[in-house]
Regions:
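Structural detector for internal amphipathic alpha-helices that build alpha-solenoid repeat scaffolds
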Residues: 1-13, 31-48, 68-85, 104-118, ...
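Short amphipathic alpha-helical patches
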Residues: 59, 136, 162-166, 177, ...
């Protein structure tokens, strides 16, 4: 899931010979099967796979006991399905993987589905209903990258999704789908003021800079430049420079000044979790997380 902010631990295979890797998929050792699937990801990313290899990957993607093997087999199939895929074996296995018990396999399957059938908007939209925030995040990214997202869809995710990574990418892509610029700026300004997660606020700041209206600049000055997070302040400074068409060095950020009144949970004047309109459960922001632990996130 390299395009979707998940690390794919490539480069572990001891060979780049497709036939050898195909045979290694039958190994009794989970580690060898996983490394074989990863090796085939690299090969598929650089070209196509033979139908016999696709067929064996399809079996690993749906029947392997190890979730890691299934995940990386699905990743390889998503790349292989962009070329000749052995009479639809790749797409069939990917669809099966969308119902896998493991969150990360389903999340990978969303990416693979967007590659194998980018026009299948219904499948990607269905993934927005998945219980896992990481699956929903990948659905938001896939819909946005395939041109099937909308301002309404992204705004709804920003307002109601409980997983911060979903809100992060919805805020990031909203700039590209802002049919109603004023409304998009209003939503992103609210995110910058009220969203509890700094990385979501940083993406909102970047989007505001690209939209570049007077209201966007006001939000960046009032909330972004006074945010308690260094990352958000840097993002806001760059965004303000983008909006004004100047070098970021020309922006007098005033980062050492006290935060502006009404800065929300991210500003240096709104330290409490229940600041003006913000914090978990606050109006318009989902504010709490679900899904996997930090250790599980980093493990991928």
């Amino acid at each position: 899931m390299t395009e979707y902010a998940n690390r794919s631990a490539r480069g572990r295979a001891r060979t780049d010979d497709e036939a050898q890797l195909r045979e290694q998929l039958l190994s009794a050792l989970e580690r060898e099967r996983r490394d074989a699937a990863l090796g085939l990801v690299d090969i598929a990313d650089g070209g196509s796979l033979q139908p016999s290899t696709v067929a064996r990957l399809a079996g690993r993607a749906t029947d392997d006991d190890a979730a890691d093997v299934r995940q990386f087999a699905v990743e390889a199939l998503g790349l292989a399905a962009q070329g000749a895929d052995g009479e639809g074996a790749a797409e069939t296995a990917i669809r099966t993987a969308l119902d896998d018990d493991e969150d990360w396999v389903r999340a990978e399957a969303v990416v693979a589905a967007s590659r194998a059938a980018p026009d299948d908007e219904a499948t990607l939209r269905e993934a927005l209903n998945d219980e896992s925030g990481y699956v929903r995040r990948n659905a938001v990214v896939a819909l946005s990258k395939t041109g099937a997202a909308s301002q309404e869809l992204l705004t709804e995710r920003i307002k109601s999704d409980r997983h911060p990574a979903v809100r992060e990418y919805a805020a990031d892509f909203l700039r590209e789908y802002a049919a109603d610029t004023a409304e998009a700026v209003r939503i992103l300004a609210a995110v910058l003021a009220r969203e509890p997660e700094a990385f979501v606020r940083a993406k909102a700041a970047a989007s505001l800079g690209d939209l570049g209206t007077d209201r966007a600049e006001e939000a960046l000055e009032r909330h972004g430049l006074n945010d308690r997070s260094d990352d958000v302040r840097r993002s806001a400074k760059r965004a303000l420079a983008t909006a004004r068409g100047v070098d970021p060095k020309q922006i007098d950020a005033g980062l050492d000044d006290p935060g502006a009144p009404g800065g929300g949970p991210g500003s240096r004047t709104g330290d409490g979790p229940d600041g003006p309109g913000g914090g978990p459960g606050g109006p318009g922001m989902a504010g709490v997380t679900d899904g996997l632990t930090q250790g599980q996130r980093e493990n991928r």
